[in-house]
Design a protein with these regions (language model features):
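General structural feature for long, well-ordered alpha-helical segments within catalytic domains
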Residues: 1, 18, 22-25, 58, ...
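N-terminal Rossmann-like NAD(P)+-binding subdomain of aldehyde/semialdehyde dehydrogenases
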Residues: 1-51
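Hydrophobic packing residues within well-ordered alpha-helices of enzyme cores
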Residues: 5, 26, 101-104, 132, ...
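A broad detector of the eukaryotic-type serine/threonine protein kinase catalytic domain
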Residues: 6-13, 67, 87, 137
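Short beta->alpha linker loops
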Residues: 7, 17-21, 95-99, 123-124, ...
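Conserved small-residue-rich beta-alpha loop and adjacent elements
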Residues: 31, 36-114
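Conserved NAD(P)+-binding/catalytic subdomain of aldehyde/semialdehyde dehydrogenases
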Residues: 36, 46, 52, 56, ...
């Protein structure tokens, strides 16, 4: 994969950093897969004869439009934070880096990730933005990039079925890695359940 990143224009040292970061991110998020619900769930105190529980649940189908900067590291960090909470994803990889997209798809295909959970596409963002944002079966969209007019268009089209819209510009992507497990909550919904006691 380092050679592919070099073919796409990165220096060897930067390509090695990308691959090592991606491996670290896979391991990091794999560790959270069976822990994040215990960390973010809670029993709510109520003064009535009820139990009240709040637990994170997956949003559903999340479409992701990846950034051109640090293509592998950014794609893997967002991909892992989305699927670790039980979502499925349709990821539009950076149009200037299609080689690593295909290798990433092959890695996901040969791993234990169930078929259909991760769907990686390559293509032109301008052509696919409308479909990603307006499709009625998509529940959330993550836009990575600096083009504000593209995000506004995605936000407008997402209003048809009230998709959650998340924008991650380059500055936010840099901080994304420092948020730890809280990145998982971006595409999770908190569900509160009330249960009677002593009846």
């Amino acid at each position: 994969m380092v050679q592919e990143l070099c073919l796409e224009g990165l220096q060897k040292k930067q390509a090695e950093f990308e691959v090592n970061s991606a491996i670290d991110l896979f391991i990091y998020y794999a560790g959270w897969a069976d822990k994040y619900q215990q960390v973010f769930s809670k029993v709510n105190p109520v003064a009535q004869p009820y139990f009240s529980f709040t637990v994170p649940e997956p949003t559903g189908v999340v479409s992701v439009l990846c950034s051109d900067n640090y293509p592998l590291k950014n794609a893997v960090s967002i991909l892992c934070s989305v699927i670790v909470s039980g979502n499925t994803t349709i990821l539009l990889y950076s149009e200037s880096n299609p080689l690593t997209a295909m290798s990433l798809a092959e890695i996901v295909h040969t791993s234990d990730v169930p078929a259909g959970v991760v769907n990686i596409l390559t293509g032109f963002r301008k052509e696919l933005l409308t479909q990603f944002a307006s499709h009625m079966d998509v529940n959330a969209i993550i836009y990575c990039g600096e083009k504000l007019e593209e995000f506004k268009e995605a936000q407008k089209l997402s209003a048809l079925n009230l998709k959650r819209c998340i924008i991650l510009n380059d500055e936010k992507l840099d901080r994304f890695y420092q948020e730890g497990p809280y990145t998982i909550l971006r595409t999770a919904e908190m569900k509160t359940t009330w249960h009677p006691v002593g009846l």
